[in-house]
Amino acid sequence: MIERLDVVEEPRKEWDLRMEIASAPRSGAVVATLRDAEVRRGGFTLGPVSLQIDWADRVAVTGANGAGKSTLLGALLGRVPLTAGQASLGSGVLIGEVDQARKLFHGEESLLDAFCAAVPDTEPVEVRTLLAKFGLKSDHVLRSAGTLSPGERTRAALALLQGRGVNLLVLDEPTNHLDLPAIEQLESALDAYEGTLLLVTHDRRMLDAVHVTRRLDVADGKVTER
């Protein structure tokens, strides 16, 4: 039975099946807000920042390494404590973060078992099909999740977001560790995604390929919309 499933689930070649990222039911009109927000860490200060992200905004966040891009994301999502000001999330916001999802695939259990534990209402056969869409074939699903390469772990995380459905998709340098076919599939999936998007990237190709409605530039802890 398992062998038969492997044959049915196996795509003819990697990335043959179309990658998608499912949208959950929409959130409220206001997704996230910062009001005079500041974050101080050692000698670094982000802000003060006043910023509102609305439903279906597609926001690219750019800036040099160490400029404060990830700190800005953490402040918006309520993960980074503020030194001053206020942060709030809107009603009905379902956050999907690739970096957080990747952390679920580091243990000794198989990729299939780890994935099924994260989406308990999804049948294993459906999980196999979903993973195959993201280039993780039958020889990946029974391996220990901890043996996945960084790129395979990112694919598994993207597949998990597809399985769960999100309405605020957060991607922090998503092209790291992905090969070109995977990047192209991701770009296509992002174009079809209908929720709110926060995309942090220094990849000029992705910035040109993915439709965004707003751009935030972070430099020396200051945030400028352009």
Question: What do the predicted segments below correspond to?
Answer:
Residues 15, 22-226:
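ABC ATP-binding cassette signature C-motif
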Residues 1-18:
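ABC transporter TMD-NBD coupling linker
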